[in-house]
Amino acid sequence: MAEQEYDLIVVGSGAGACWAPIRAQEQGLKTLVVEKTELFGGTSALSGGGIWIPLNYDQKTAGIKDDLETAFGYMKRCVRGMATDDRVLAYVETASKMAEYLRQIGIPYRAMAKYADYYPHIEGSRPGGRTMDPVDFNAARLRVTALETMRPGPPGNQLFGRMSISAFEAHSMLSRELKSRFTILGIMLKYFLDYPWRNKTRRDRRMTGGQALVAGLLTAANKARVEMWCNSPLKELVQDASGRVTGVIVERNGQRQQINARRGVLLGAGGFERNQEMRDQYLNKPTRLVDGNPCGRQYGDAHRAGQAWAHTGADGLVLGRAHHGCSQGAGLSRHFRGTLAAGVHGGQRQGAALPQRVRPVSGIPAAMLAENAKGNGGVPAWIVFDASFRAQNPMGPLMPGSAVPDSKVRKSWLNNVYWKGRRWKIWRADRRGRAGLQVSARRMTEYARAGKDLDFDRGGNVFDRYYGDPRLKNPNLGPIEKGPFYAMRLWPGEIGTKGGLLTDREGRVLDTQGRIIEGLYCVGNNSASVMAPAYAGAGSTLGPAMTFAFRAVADMVGKPLPLENPHLLGKTV
């Protein structure tokens, strides 16, 4: 078996995995990235690209006041003791430094001043400014040849499946701002008039979100001369007699190769959402492969490689976590858009309303699973809306009716989407919940007219209102009164799993006794998330992935980052 040697070997090529070798090369380490698939970028390339960064450099520009103790207290309350204080503090202290380094290597971000933290009722939350969105990236900087090796973004995140839109533009459109019409027109004109670029590739020259982040990282990696292999799946980790991880065995060009690592191996290969066996073993039931993220090949290979000696939590406590999302079933959509929009009512099969007060939206599928476990028919649930909503809004995989009328709805979707001219007929889609759904939908319409949700207080906080319709009395409540009426099945799914190998504050993997495994580091969805079961704000996946990669590289080069505020550890909040 052929052997090669590097200082650092990184498994995976998402944001955290791609970020680490750039920093390591700058620090004088010889690095190698091994990617299982034929494309670089992982699920980071499919994401919105946001990062949750307390105390970030753009908060002052956005007019947001923040301080470390407040941010630490908020995050500590969110994780509810399921992540150690020192990891939480390490994240809050280091995230802003990581974001500043991103800016230095040509990947600037801007704070989203109006995008609130996901738990506005928890002390220490902020009404905006902690979530950052990547600045647009010109794909020409990456070159077309390199662009073709990068995973493309999902069509659902683009205008008409082609044109890139930023989080700011998406908010403008969904909020019905007048300027959004001109924004859409400008995006379309710029795309179609860019003949020189469109003759080279169908991809938009203007890259936003996760595409902008990953393209920026790949550009920086090329500049730093990071060696990157695709089609090179991890097969084994190599340990010496003392238990230190000294390298990996990968399969490349049909042959196994051992690659030795002088400083360490960093696992950043994502979650296990494409592995039905692991889903059945660790995730809450029911768990269907079709409701997971359909993109990529997250089979948990790196989880399995380290699981023999790494700490993954008793009884799946750590491995059983996921970034929940709503699914329309049948693999139709990675995201279920519009779940909390005005004019939408969610109901369980027994008729009770879905707990749409649960924030963030990932709380809805978690609540569905909990209700289902009690025998209350929480899975699947139903989303109900009327013709007025359908005409103007996307819902799950459906584009607005003004763009895709009912006659053009794909036949393969018809077992999941129902519509009838009279309201009572749609309840035939699920007879067991018919009466209760009618009552709860009627009550929601009454609340919309009054402008107050007496059940769940939708629209009662800044997070709800961000994507609301300002033309309504309550921006998050709309009536369901104009036929035809629509019902769509709603399944609990996940954008990705976030349970994995347990690490310390430097990203070092711990063994089953809680001791450090020398030479082995882990970040992102490959590790047990510092957010535990929570999601502090938009960007709570990519932010920690890159921040702990930052700390891991510092540890590898012998310059570990000390905690600057140890007096906060153990403090009651």
Swiss-Prot record:
Pathway stated in the Swiss-Prot or TrEMBL entry: Lipid metabolism; steroid degradation
Subcellular location(s) of the protein: Cell inner membrane
Membrane protein topology class: Peripheral membrane protein
E.C. number: 1.3.99.4
Cofactor(s) annotated in UniProt: FAD
Protein name as it appears in the record: 3-oxosteroid 1-dehydrogenase
GO biological process, one term: steroid metabolic process
This protein's UniProt keywords: Cell inner membrane, Cell membrane, FAD, Flavoprotein, Lipid metabolism, Membrane, Oxidoreductase, Steroid metabolism
Physiological role: Dehydrogenates steroids by introducing a double bond in steroid ring A.
Enzyme superclass (EC): oxidoreductase
Family to which this protein belongs: Belongs to the FAD-dependent oxidoreductase 2 family. 3-oxosteroid dehydrogenase subfamily.
Binding-site positions, FAD: 7-36
Catalytic activity: a 3-oxosteroid + A = a 3-oxo-Delta(1)-steroid + AH2
InterPro entries, per the entry: FAD-dep_OxRdtase_2_FAD-bd (IPR003953), FAD-oxidoreductase_2 (IPR050315), FAD/NAD-bd_sf (IPR036188), Succ_DH/fumarate_Rdtase_cat_sf (IPR027477)
Molecular function per GO: 3-oxosteroid 1-dehydrogenase activity
GO CC terms in record: plasma membrane
